[in-house]
Amino acid sequence: MADRSILTREIIVGGRPMILETGRLANQASGAVFVRYGDTAVLVTATVAPTVRAGIDFFPLTVDYEERFYAVGKIPGGFIKRESRPSEKAILSGRLIDRPIRPLFPKEMRNEVQVIATILSVDQDNAPEIAAMVGASAALHISEIPLKFPIGGVIVGRVDGRFVINPVLAQAEKSDMHLVVAGTKDAVMMVEAGAKEVPEEVILEAISFGHETVKEIVAFIERYREEALEMGLAKEKMVIEVAEPDPVLVEAVTGPATEKLDGVLRRCVNERLSKQERDSLLNNIKDELMQKFLADYPEQESLIKDLLDSIEKKLVRRMITEEGLRIDGRALNEVRPISVEVGVLPRPHGSGLFTRGQTQILSVVTLGTVSEEQILDGLGVEESKRFMHHYNFPPYSTGETRPLRSPGRREIGHGALAERALAAVIPGEEEFPYTIRIVSEALESNGSTSMGSVCGSTLALMDAGVPISAPVAGVAMGLIKEGDNFTVLTDIQGFEDHLGDMDFKVAGTAKGITALQMDIKIPGITREVFEKALAQAYEGRMHILNKMLEVLPAPRPELSPHAPRIIHITIDPDKIRDVIGPGGKVIKKIVEETGAEIDIEDDGRVFIAAVDQEKGRKAQEIIETLTKEVQTGEIYTGRVTRITDFGCFVEIIPGVLGMQGKEGLVHISQLAHHRVNRVEDVVKEGDVILVKVTGYDSQGRLKLSKKEATPPPESTAMKEGRAHRPSRRRESAR
């Protein structure tokens, strides 16, 4: 360790120092950077395989985000007591790093690259995912891996109308947006946001604001590499060899293939063929061309296939940019035909079927109790989540077969995006004390199933009677960029996503944006593109919202008869033990008697859930009886339970579920306004009488008075009045 060179440099980000260090840790990796941001510490390594992975036609990049519970001083729960599969947060953070760097590698690269971000220490004010993103960029930049440009990334919040870079926890809780911006020094590469109905122009300003800090981070990383090179801590970039295709073959294929494919593509446009019809037609013509060219070039199958795909891509892009023609015949800003249905399933609490072109989503809502909230056991602040959205993408949605496995990164990412889009309109617990779970099933997929899930989920929520503050819709925007010219497409389908340069998903209400996610395949986009895309997305979103509201203009006024009815009451926290009882005996009796489900919070909030509302009311009455406070000075109607020589015991709050109620003693002197010799002369066991609470004795027992609860007879009152009048004899004696 002593003879190792170590490079440590610091940059101020969001008013706090971010420190990068290399040379001390993980020196066998291609590049390794230790990032310290406050008390958050992340080790990011980048490693490349020395040889090309054979038999693939894509870039094999993997980004792993590894959480360690020791980072927050915790031991993992469960029997095994060690970290296992990555959490949802870890998967989303890995995707957050992957998306801005992937377009910056040479498109010909086939060497495996693995980036691993290991979270070593976490405070709650400095986001580890941002430290990991900056660390990944720096580790790649000092390595031999040929990343074209380094990137930077920040979170932009808005507190009291002012933008904040990388807000701390207290600021984040007040912010109306959580926007992640990543990019190079020249352009934005990735945007992801959750927001509370923020207008488009504010989002644009936030992106520009964040990009200014991103530029500073990129310049810092570039200087860091220069210093690392001087110290022998950085490596010269590897060269990716690109085999030039045989020009004779290219010429032989290009002319005939262009003519044939152009004719087929124009037929697709003119006849507005479906996805299956178009794919079949294109595959047949490609197979025909392939057989023709293979006869002359039998060893060039892979190259011929690449040439045909390239020609197809160029033709489609040219038709869009030069002629304004889309493959399905739509206008550039036209949304596919929309079909909307609600209440399609009889037993679930709410359901919506949203179809847009050949993309179809079935969203289903389930309402549960507070105890069914999801407990988030991760590296952040311990909390629970009462609103969840899950997304499923079965193989039949694209007419394919494949093994069914647990949700992958794509499913988790799509589910989280739709969840962010809807979170801003979900009612608070005080207004709607339910746990809400939505599952969106992608029944058909031809582009933007995540935005279809937003629309389907909104319909399902309204069908379930959830009082959302506003309906939400989403649309995916595309981009075709040729030189300085660009064309923005509304509601892209799968074919356009595959051949285009951008997938920009925008969700929101009529008032503003609730979620954004942008992925691109080119080295960044400009503010002009953002402005055009957001303006066009607003038009598309409003069109979709209007179609949805034609079917169901507002949330249903009543819940489904199959949904639990939840009653919310608040009791004195000191009375919780009375409801629970020794060993849970009392609350178990209440549940057995009523069939209701009862959740009690430490602050005294009680949630009573029952499908039968009468059973819920019965449980409420029992709990209110158990926790009812006896007020001194108040008059109660009670039943005489026992008689003794010195008085009688009166139950003023009846017992429930066979348990004793609240009773007190009426002393013999407090039974009547006249002298009482025998208690039985005034009351008998079982009598119902009025009593007044006069206080508590030294042992905390209730003291009651029948005398003070009833007016005295007139004759007694007169006697008592004379008895209290001072005598003349005493007066004269004074």
UniProtKB/Swiss-Prot annotation:
UniProt cross-references to SUPFAM superfamilies, sorted A to Z: Eukaryotic type KH-domain (KH-domain type I) (SSF54791), Nucleic acid-binding proteins (SSF50249), Ribonuclease PH domain 2-like (SSF55666), Ribosomal protein S5 domain 2-like (SSF54211)
Pfam families named in the record: KH_1, PNPase, RNase_PH, RNase_PH_C, S1
Tell me yes or no: is Cell division among this UniProt entry's keywords.
no
Q: What family does this chain come from, according to its entry?
A: Belongs to the polyribonucleotide nucleotidyltransferase family.
PANTHER family (UniProt xref) = POLYRIBONUCLEOTIDE NUCLEOTIDYLTRANSFERASE, POLYRIBONUCLEOTIDE NUCLEOTIDYLTRANSFERASE 1, MITOCHONDRIAL
Specify the enzyme's EC class, one word: transferase
Q: GO molecular function terms here?
A: 3'-5'-RNA exonuclease activity; magnesium ion binding; polyribonucleotide nucleotidyltransferase activity; RNA binding
* Gene3D superfamilies, per database record: GHMP Kinase, N-terminal domain, K Homology domain, type 1, Nucleic acid-binding proteins
State its role: Involved in mRNA degradation. Catalyzes the phosphorolysis of single-stranded polyribonucleotides processively in the 3'- to 5'-direction.
Segment Disordered: which positions?
700-734
Residue ranges of domain S1 motif in the record: 633-707
**What SMART domains would the database entry show?**
KH, S1
Task: Provide one Gene Ontology cellular component.
Answer: cytosol
Record's protein name? Polyribonucleotide nucleotidyltransferase
Q: Per UniProt, which keywords does this protein have?
A: Cytoplasm, Magnesium, Metal-binding, Nucleotidyltransferase, RNA-binding, Transferase
Domain KH spans what residues?
A: 564-623
Respond yes or no to whether keyword Cytoplasm is given for this record.
Answer: yes
Q: Where is the composition biased (Basic and acidic residues)?
A: 717-734
Per its UniProt record, the required cofactor names are: Mg(2+)
State where the protein is found: Cytoplasm
The record's EC number reads 2.7.7.8
Q: Which GO terms describe its biological process?
A: mRNA catabolic process; RNA processing
Per its UniProt record, what HAMAP family does this chain match?
A: PNPase (MF_01595)
**Database matches in InterPro entries:** ExoRNase_PH_dom1, ExoRNase_PH_dom2, ExoRNase_PH_dom2_sf, KH_dom, KH_dom_type_1, KH_dom_type_1_sf, NA-bd_OB-fold, PNPase
Residues annotated as binding Mg(2+): D497, D503
Reactions performed catalytically: RNA(n+1) + phosphate = RNA(n) + a ribonucleoside 5'-diphosphate
